[in-house]
Amino acid sequence: MEKYVSFMTCADFIVSTPDYFRYNPADEFITPEQIEEIAANTKSSLSGTGYAVRKPVYLWMTEDALRQDYARYESAEQLDSHMSRMEHRGDMVMGDTRIEALDNSLFDKLQVFDGDISPMLEPNNNAIAIAVSLDDYGNLPNPEYYPKVGDTITATYADDVKYIDSRTGELRTEDTPEEYFQEKLYGARDVEYTVCALVELPYSMSYRYGGIGYETVLSVDTAQRDSGGAAIPMLYLFDTADDADEAEAEQYLSKLTAGEFSPLMYESKATARSEFAQFRQMFLLIGGILCAIIGLVGLLNFFNAMMTGILSRRREFAVLQAVGMTNRQLKTMLIYEGLFYAMSSVAVAFILSLAVGPLAGKMLGSMFWFFEYQFTVLPVLLTIPVFLLLGLLIPCMMYDNAAKCSVVEQLRDAQ
């Protein structure tokens, strides 16, 4: 469960507005006053704010990298046309970017894939971290897409952006064909950053949507300095020291966000655990039904095999009784035989569990990243008393039914 919870949320509590959690663009999210109120009414061991840079900003990246982004949405012909309209500097192209600024306390939430984030904690730094997309198993599928640690990259901040008609230099109109659209930046200025690290930015504290270009991380002081104070609070997150503080915070936030028109929403590890419990319950229900069906079929087959074995040997049993075997001896023999079949079935089930269990666990682990296989003999142990009981009762019932007839009648029926 904790593997699932840690993936779904990186903190005990994340608070913002409904627009943030519903992926709606907004000019304002959670306010500093709301953050202060929450901080004053909760006990936290770690807390901080994530900021969105609400200003046009672009990052200069290689054309090959930008082509990888657009190739997901455009044909080769459209892509070539698009690239020809974009602003170039040598082999670099001006691409979109998403810059998120973090309080220094939140850098502990980043998973460093390569490099070191400590330069971002220094005052007046020009360090930037590139957020990479790792797969469910922590691997970087396309390392060539990202800049290298130590590279210098240029970001262009602008006060405003307009689309113009590249033929006339005037603002575009409704009649302007798309192939002549061109961005024009007003009040643009460049800032050079040094890539200090490639990091995984947890989804739960990111913008929560993708796009074209790199997603980057700056310290809040650097972002405010370079954007002219355009970094606004986007989310507030905090961890609690113990379960009691977590329960108190959960109760407080549930009251604070109650109501359909509440200006705030929150996510917590408690909600993630509840989601996992429902997900797990679905697997238990479906798996339990399938196991019950398979188990019932297995028991019926076991019952049928034993019953058929006894009925097919009625003549043999009658002959044994005719030559002197007592009813008690015959019944005891059948019981031991039934118990032998029962324990043989359990032994085969145990061997199959040892052989098939790890293979099935590996297969499920490749399908569900949060799945961890753990071998258990409990299901096999639970079948032992059931099979022993069947191995004891079936011979007794079948023999008692046959013993109602004399040996002569049994021989005649067997013929």
PLM features: what roles do these ranges have?
Residues 281-305:
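Internal alpha-helical transmembrane segments of multipass membrane proteins
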Residues 6-12, 408-415:
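Short, highly charged, low-complexity non-transmembrane loops/tails of multi-pass membrane proteins
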Residues 298-341:
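Interfacial "coupling" helices/loops that link adjacent transmembrane helices in transporter permeases
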Residues 230-231, 238-240, 288-293, 323-337:
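Hydrophobic alpha-helical transmembrane segments
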Residues 1-2, 347:
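Short, strongly hydrophobic transmembrane alpha-helices
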Residues 273-283, 329-333, 342-409:
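Short helix-loop junctions at transmembrane helix boundaries
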Residues 195, 236-238, 253, 276, ...:
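Hydrophobic, well-ordered secondary-structure elements that form the walls
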Residues 2-287:
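Basic-flanked hydrophobic alpha-helices used for secretion and membrane insertion
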